[in-house]
Amino acid sequence: MTTEAAKEESVEWTLAGLLELFDVEPAGDDVFVGQTGYAGHDERQVVEGTQVLAQAIVAVAKRFPGKSVRSAYAVFARAVVVGPPVELALDVVAEGRSTATAIVNVTQGGKRCITLTVFTDVPSDDVIRHQLARPDVVAPAEANHAHMPMVGRQLRLVDVVDVNSPDEVGPPELHAWLHYDPIPERVELAKALVAYFTGHLGISTTMRAHEGIGTAQAHLTVSTAPMTISVSFHEPFAWSGWLLYTHESTQVGAGMSYVRGAVHSEEGELIASFGQDALIRPLRTSDTSIKAESRL
């Protein structure tokens, strides 16, 4: 075994390591470079699209200091693979005193993979204010522990034991408690971290309503992939303790599903809202399988 292969095999994902990946470095005028990490134990060679979404949020925050990232919309046109870095090129659409917008083109190896639109502004005083109430679900201590191999992160599911199982049948909704330790002090990294999980359970949410199908079959008998994700951050953006991710699948058909979601603090503050379009289609003969533990 080569030294590099041994290094990859021994990699243990940590929250600190994930935040390092999010913290992209400048590489020229309006250009940033981000690392993709290692495949790790699950042998997954495809980078999570939300990892690059998180990197784009950080890049735009660095480009527009003094402004707050309020929303981001990503289209995942081509997979990013583990290994080579990605380049994030910012096209500044407009930059004013109170708002700024950039289109982020993400390339790897000279090929465009992801396009994002990110909006920022300077938060103002309230004219009016209301929010969606946090769902009345069991507390984290009463929820089911879920295996998620990352040091510094805990996941607990409400009313679901194995989110991948085709035997987990219920309404097309999922509630997940998530805990990070430590919570990033830099707000752009905190927003990137919240955005990162928005793509993890959407497909499972949709499949839950249909008997005999689950994400354990993803890339074995069905082809699945998030294709777009949108996330909006609500000010003031801050939390301590646990986060509750609520997912609701409002439609699936013709090979695509749509999920909308919300992120509440344990105290009940709505800090983010998100949406996901995902592909759910019969497996093509050209598709390849991945290990079950990487499908969460």
Whereabouts are the PLM-identified features?
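Terminal targeting signals and extreme-terminal segments of soluble enzymes
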Residues: 1-296
